Regions:
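Residue-level signal for inorganic ion chemistry
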Residues: 15, 67, 119, 181, ...
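N-terminal flexible segment immediately upstream of the FAD-binding catalytic core
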Residues: 1-65, 82-112, 264-275, 320-343, ...
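Conserved, mostly hydrophobic/aromatic
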Residues: 67, 208, 453
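Activity-critical C-terminal alpha-helical subdomain
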Residues: 182, 430-466
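FAD-binding subdomain of flavoenzyme oxidoreductases
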Residues: 103-258, 458
Length: 466
C-alpha cells in the first residue's frame, strides 16, 4: 500500500493552475455531497479533501500527474449510482467528477457506432441512437442518472443483457488517461481484430483502478420496430425460474427476462402508489420483453411465450405496461419504506444453477434476523439479494450480514458463480474477492495493477487491496 501525503495548500494552488478556480472545490458543502455514492450506511462515508471538475482529457491528465507528484490518491466519480462504495474516497484525497465531459461527438449511421465523452448520461446515449432508428443495447436500471463512463468502469449489465450482452459487448474503443497521466486511445470500430492485446477490454470493468475513461466508441445496431412486454405471474418461484430455459430453447430470443419476488411486488407497488398491481398479495412477477423486425414473428413468439408460461404454472399472463417496469426499476429504492439501511448483492451463477441458488438463499436466510427480497435478471443468472437492517444494532447487522454473505458466496463459487454480475466490487466486496478468488488469478490482477499504477494513485482500496 502506498503511503499517501495529505492535501496541502500548495497542492490546491497547483490544481488551480490546471483548472479554472471555480472547478476546484474545497468548501464543506461540496465535500459533504461527495462523501458517498448510493451507499446508505454512514459508517462507509468518507470525505474527500478536494473535488475537481475537469473539462477534458488534458485537464484530467494534468490532475493525475499532479496526484503522482504529491502522492495524493484520486477517486473518479461518474453519476454516483454505484452501491459497492466504488466512488467513495476511502483514502481521502481528490474526487474527480466527469460531469463536464458530456458531449456526444459523433453518431455514424453507416458504420453503426457512436463516439461520446464519458460523462454523458446513458439515457442520452440511448435517446440519440433511437432518434436515428438505432439501438444502443446497454440498459442499466439507473440509465436516467448513471454515466456511460461509469457503465464501462463497472461493466454494467441491465435488463437487455440476456439478448445483447453486458457493457463490454457494446464497446469498440476507449480513450483513457493512464495512472501516469498519459492520454491513450485503445481499440477501434472494427468488427474483428487480432492485433496484439485487447487493452480496451482490460480497462472495461476495472472500476477506475487502471485508468480514467474519458471517451468511448460504442456499437450501435438497427432498432427492432416491433415489441411486446409481457407479465407472467406465478405463485411458485421455481416454476417462474423454470421458464427461462424453455424460452431460450424455443428460439424466442427474448430481450429481457426479469424476476421480482412477492415482497418486492408488494413494496414497490406501495412505494409507487400503485395499489392495483396485478396479484399484489401473492404474485411473483416474470417480465418478458420480445422484439422483432417482423410483426408476424412478434405475434408468433408472443403466443409461444404465453403458452410456455402457462404450461409452467403461470396463473396469469398479461401485457406489461410502464408501471410494471417502474416497479422493477424501483426494487432497491422501495425498501426505504421499511429500512433506512439495506444492502444489495448481485451474485451471478450459470443460468442452469439459478433455481437451486434461489432455493438455497431462501432456505439460508431463514436462520437470520433480516427480511429478504430477491429481484433478478434471471435470463443471465444475475440475482439481486436485498437485505434490510431494520432495528438491528450496527454490531449485530455487521456480524449477521457477514455470516450470511459468506454462506451465499461459498455456495455460488461451488456452483460456478462469482461475487458480482454487474455492480462491481468497489471497496465493499474487496475482502470477499480476496477471499474467494483463486490465488493465481488474484496475484495476476495485483501484478497488472502494480505495473499500470505503481504509486496506487487511482481508486485505491477498490477491487482488492495492495
Amino acid at each position: 500500500m502506498s503511503n499517501y501525503n495529505s492535501v496541502t495548500p500548495e497542492f490546491i494552488d497547483e490544481l488551480k493552475t490546471l483548472l479554472d478556480e471555480k472547478y476546484v472545490k474545497t468548501d464543506a458543502d461540496t465535500l459533504d455531497r461527495y462523501k458517498t455514492d448510493e451507499e446508505a450506511d454512514e459508517r462507509c462515508f468518507h470525505l474527500p479533501d478536494v473535488v475537481v471538475i475537469p473539462a477534458n482529457s488534458e485537464e484530467i491528465a494534468g490532475v493525475v500527474k499532479l496526484c503522482n507528484k504529491y502522492l495524493v490518491p484520486l477517486t473518479v466519480r461518474g453519476g454516483g449510482t454505484g452501491i459497492v462504495d466504488g466512488a467513495i474516497a476511502d483514502k481521502g484525497g481528490v474526487v474527480l467528477l466527469m460531469e463536464r465531459l458530456n458531449k456526444i461527438i459523433e453518431l455514424n449511421k453507416e458504420g453503426l457506432y457512436m463516439v461520446a465523452q464519458a460523462g454523458v448520461r446513458t439515457l442520452d446515449i440511448q435517446a440519440a441512437a433511437k432518434a436515428e432508428n438505432l439501438l444502443y443495447a446497454g440498459d442499466p436500471s439507473s440509465s436516467d442518472s448513471c454515466q456511460i463512463g461509469g457503465n464501462l468502469a463497472t461493466n454494467a449489465g441491465g435488463i437487455k443483457a440476456v439478448r445483447y450482452g453486458v457493457t463490454r459487448n457494446q464497446v469498440y474503443a476507449v480513450q483513457i488517461v493512464t495512472p501516469y497521466g498519459d492520454i491513450v486511445d485503445l481499440g477501434s470500430p472494427l468488427k474483428k481484430c487480432s492485433t496484439g492485446y485487447c487493452m480496451e477490454q482490460l480497462v472495461i470493468g476495472s472500476e477506475g483502478t487502471l485508468g480514467i475513461i474519458t471517451q468511448v466508441t460504442l456499437k450501435l445496431q438497427p432498432l427492432p420496430p416491433y415489441k411486446i412486454d409481457m407479465l407472467a405471474i406465478f405463485h411458485d418461484p421455481m416454476a417462474a425460474i423454470g421458464v427461462v430455459p424453455q424460452l431460450v430453447k424455443a428460439g424466442i430470443d427474448p430481450t429481457s427476462i426479469e424476476y421480482m419476488d412477492n415482497p418486492n411486488v408488494r413494496t414497490t407497488s406501495e412505494y409507487l402508489e400503485f395499489p392495483g398491481a396485478p396479484h399484489i398479495e401473492d404474485g411473483i412477477y416474470v417480465i418478458i420483453t420480445i422484439e422483432t423486425f417482423n410483426e408476424d414473428e412478434l405475434d408468433m413468439k408472443m403466443e409461444q411465450a404465453s403458452d410456455i408460461c402457462e404450461a409452467a404454472g403461470a396463473v396469469d399472463v398479461l401485457e406489461a405496461d410502464e408501471r410494471i417496469w417502474s416497479m422493477r426499476r424501483n426494487c432497491l429504492e422501495s425498501v426505504s419504506l421499511i429500512s433506512k439501511v439495506c444492502t444489495t448483492d448481485d451474485v451471478v451463477v450459470p443460468v442452469d444453477e439459478m433455481s437451486d441458488m434461489i432455493q438455497y438463499i431462501i432456505k439460508t436466510v431463514a436462520k437470520y434476523p433480516f427480511p429478504l427480497r430477491i429481484n433478478a435478471h434471471i435470463g443471465d443468472g444475475n440475482l439481486h439479494i436485498v437485505l434490510c437492517k431494520l432495528d438491528l444494532s450496527d454490531e449485530e447487522w455487521e456480524s449477521e450480514l457477514s455470516r450470511f454473505t459468506e454462506e451465499v458466496y461459498t455456495y455460488a463459487y461451488a456452483h460456478g458463480g462469482r461475487l458480482s454480475g454487474e455492480h462491481g466490487i468497489g471497496s465493499k466486496k474487496a475482502h470477499f474477492l480476496e477471499r474467494f478468488t483463486p490465488s493465481g488469478e488474484l496475484e495476476l490482477m495485483r501484478k497488472i495493477k502494480k505495473a499500470w499504477d505503481p504509486n496506487n494513485i487511482l481508486n485505491p482500496g477498490k477491487v482488492f487491496n495492495l
